[in-house]
Amino acid sequence: MPRGSRARGSKRKRSWNTECPSFPGERPLQVRRAGLRTAGAAASLSEAWLRCGEGFQNTSGNPSLTAEEKTITEKHLELCPRPKQETTTSKSTSGLTDITWSSSGSDLSDEDKTLSQLQRDELQFIDWEIDSDRAEASDCDEFEDDEGAVEISDCASCASNQSLTSDEKLSELPKPSSIEILEYSSDSEKEDDLENVLLIDSESPHKYHVQFASDARQIMERLIDPRTKSTETILHTPQKPTAKFPRTPENSAKKKLLRGGLAERLNGLQNRERSAISLWRHQCISYQKTLSGRKSGVLTVKILELHEECAMQVAMCEQLLGSPATSSSQSVAPRPGAGLKVLFTKETAGYLRGRPQDTVRIFPPWQKLIIPSGSCPVILNTYFCEKVVAKEDSEKTCEVYCPDIPLPRRSISLAQMFVIKGLTNNSPEIQVVCSGVATTGTAWTHGHKEAKQRIPTSTPLRDSLLDVVESQGAASWPGAGVRVVVQRVYSLPSRDSTRGQQGASSGHTDPAGTRACLLVQDACGMFGEVHLEFTMSKARQLEGKSCSLVGMKVLQKVTRGRTAGIFSLIDTLWPPAIPLKTPGRDQPCEEIKTHLPPPALCYILTAHPNLGQIDIIDEDPIYKLYQPPVTRCLRDILQMNDLGTRCSFYATVIYQKPQLKSLLLLEQREIWLLVTDVTLQTKEERDPRLPKTLLVYVAPLCVLGSEVLEALAGAAPHSLFFKDALRDQGRIVCAERTVLLLQKPLLSVVSGASSCELPGPVMLDSLDSATPVNSICSVQGTVVGVDESTAFSWPVCDMCGNGRLEQRPEDRGAFSCGDCSRVVTSPVLKRHLQVFLDCRSRPQCRVKVKLLQRSISSLLRFAAGEDGSYEVKSVLGKEVGLLNCFVQSVTAHPTSCIGLEEIELLSAGGASAEH
């Protein structure tokens, strides 16, 4: 096989993929078939080059070629004329063009490398479309049929075809003006990083380099010397165009940064910065040793005020002479007591956790920026900082510091940034209002001019919340407000809080890790949820009132698909009670009241720490939009078919699981409440198909107030008001935005729903096939078996009921109680017993009941033997009275079995049941 040729696959079968060697003395292919050129072939070749080179830039000074110098390639590319020494070549030899197809791994001659290096300096990029391969294949077909003047050969190097040396040719060549065409139709994934360029010298016709690295070969087109000809010509089919597109950083699985680019340099800078900071914190002890020296370069400042500005923490500081711990130390700073403005990044501020009156050491390399018109210098590059804490104040600092207190944020207008006097002087002043946020910082008196921010009393109030959001954007609204009515007030857990923090609260304070929320509605019907820093007792006073919202900030825009919970609450307030206003009109429209669909979006708002303000508007007609929750009885709620809707009711809690005896046991857990009311207990009012009790599931996301938590920890039954609970299949769910209250609010009440007092003892449903899990029922049956594997007994203290008694040898085997610190002479014996019952209501079912101590004592009263032990046969066949049981499990496969646990209902004077 000739040099430079490669084996072709079996799939690449074409009639013109053959070898055509030329013998010595034979005329070139171009001369023999010169008369076969047609206008159609020239036109097709011209169209192909025009498609591929639409982006070529026209160069000035390209005169038309003579008839003797027009080859196929030169005719359609309009190259520059030849040098003068070649104008005397014959017509046959001047039209000869040799395109060399070579592999990308073959070695080029020295002159090729030199010329390519010269041409790389003036490359111009032109995008090459993907159909360039198809145009190339079609051109090759026309070459075979009509364009016989082109000779195609495959060789490794054609340096021997030139009689001149490389230095002579380089001296004769003018400055090349090359064009680089990117070829993106890559056939090899391993060569994606190679350059696919087409180098065309528009000045010199000696050499034309065509490199296709994506095709794993290099194409060199040059004008051969008429005295030397190639001894063999090999025709090869170019690679077929494939559907594989180049991998870009957007669709590449492994994204790589461009070497030497800006992204790589920034990435390296960030890595070096993090490494330097980590290394400095690791070697912080060695820096402490240099504090006493005069050339340490450590800047010691005292923080006077902190605020956030443009995602940076700005600290107004006072420069100190030295460290407060060492009065003899001297700082490098020559001006003790001078005012400084220190900038901390978000990461540095999070690590430093500085507060007013804290002392901070700033280690080099810090920089000082002095602004000519500024009030004080600015300290930059504060990556290496350390807070100084005295030993006697270390414990107090840890107790006083509260990371949850947000820093005040200052929004600076563009007029203040660019000192536009026409806007800054005439713009209304904005007042800083801190609603429920503790002020952190002291007055800055070192020449710092704080901008007076005051909300004008004549702030225009709009009727549409949507108009304010669209005009003001997601930022705070310093100069605009909206009139709303507060429809609901509830608590939501904070995003970074857990339910376990609720157990730490006591008294009448709000649970920790929660925030008060207001569901507001404007005059046009748009709803919004406002997150506040108020206490719930203060926020509840706003329900049903018309208020003005000023200085709000949009946190999120939610839809029904994302947040279904808030829209289930909005649906209970729709349609509106009065006609709504149309944006842009002063008077409400009667048609809007009934023809508007329910809202599909809602804005989550928050009060700006400095600008947020909520004021009650007296005698505003928008308060008529308020719709209090409609209270229903449990009988009506069970007869409703609308699942997923909100409902409000009064009910008496007769049992809860788990039994919470202390507030310390309240954690982020689910609670099951069994409730009932008069409509389910009275025979005259209740439907026999309805249950006598109803299950209420309290989800972990439901925030419970301190009063409700104390009531759940007690043993007495309590009546609760369930506000905006979710209706589910056979139960009620208390989820987010559900409120549980002990006191009865002044709300509209349906007849029969306000009576919370039960007429007598609580009646339960009997066990049957329809009894669900997590419900309570009454059971009566005959003992048919005992679970001996789980039966055991243990002694407890007769004074305090402690079950962890110790038996000491020095007390002659007597038990001692650690809680009472005394010897227990007569301990009480407790037993654990589970029996199987034969119930008439479930004849084919295996009923297993875990008995209470009272039922066990009654069952074993006359079954004890002479030695104090009990025989199983002594309890078989005994009747068990009416037991109140909690359904723990119901299984139907492989056998029908029900697991019950005997419980004791909450009574006014009783204690919790012992299990």
Curated annotation (Swiss-Prot):
Keywords of the record: Disease variant, DNA damage, DNA recombination, DNA repair, Nucleus
Please report any disulfide bonds recorded for this protein chain, giving both cysteine positions: none
According to its UniProt record, where is this protein mainly located?
nucleus
Q: What biological-process terms (Gene Ontology) are attached?
A: cellular response to camptothecin; cellular response to hydroxyurea; cellular response to ionizing radiation; DNA damage response; double-strand break repair via homologous recombination; positive regulation of double-strand break repair; positive regulation of protein-containing complex assembly; regulation of double-strand break repair via homologous recombination
The protein's location, in the record's own words, is: Nucleus
Q: Return any one Pfam family short name.
A: DUF4502
Induction conditions: Up-regulated in vascular endothelial cells treated with IL4. (Microbial infection) Up-regulated upon SARS-CoV infection.
Could you tell me where the Basic residues compositional bias lies? 1-15
Biased amino acid composition, Polar residues: 56-65, 86-107
Q: Give positions of region: Disordered.
A: 1-30, 56-114
Q: Which parts of this chain are annotated as the region Necessary for interaction with RAD51?
A: 151-450
Q: Name the residue ranges with Basic and acidic residues bias.
A: 67-85
GO cellular component: a single term: nuclear chromosome
**What's the domain of life for this entry?**
Eukaryota
Disease listed for this protein: Ovarian dysgenesis 9: An autosomal recessive form of ovarian dysgenesis, a disorder characterized by lack of spontaneous pubertal development, primary amenorrhea, uterine hypoplasia, and hypergonadotropic hypogonadism as a result of streak gonads.
Q: What does this protein do?
A: Plays a role in DNA double-strand break (DBS) repair via homologous recombination (HR). Serves as a scaffolding protein that helps to promote the recruitment of DNA-processing enzymes like the helicase BLM and recombinase RAD51 to site of DNA damage, and hence contributes to maintain genomic integrity.
Q: How does it assemble?
A: Found in a complex, at least composed of BLM, RAD51 and SPIDR; the complex formation is mediated by SPIDR. Interacts (via C-terminal region) with BLM; the interaction is direct. Interacts with RAD51; the interaction is direct. Interacts (via the C-terminal region) with FIGNL1 (via N-terminal one-half region); the interaction is direct.
Q: What is this protein called?
A: DNA repair-scaffolding protein
This chain's source organism reads Homo sapiens (Human)
Instruction: List the lineage, top down.
Output: Eukaryota, Metazoa, Chordata, Craniata, Vertebrata
Gene name tied to this protein: SPIDR
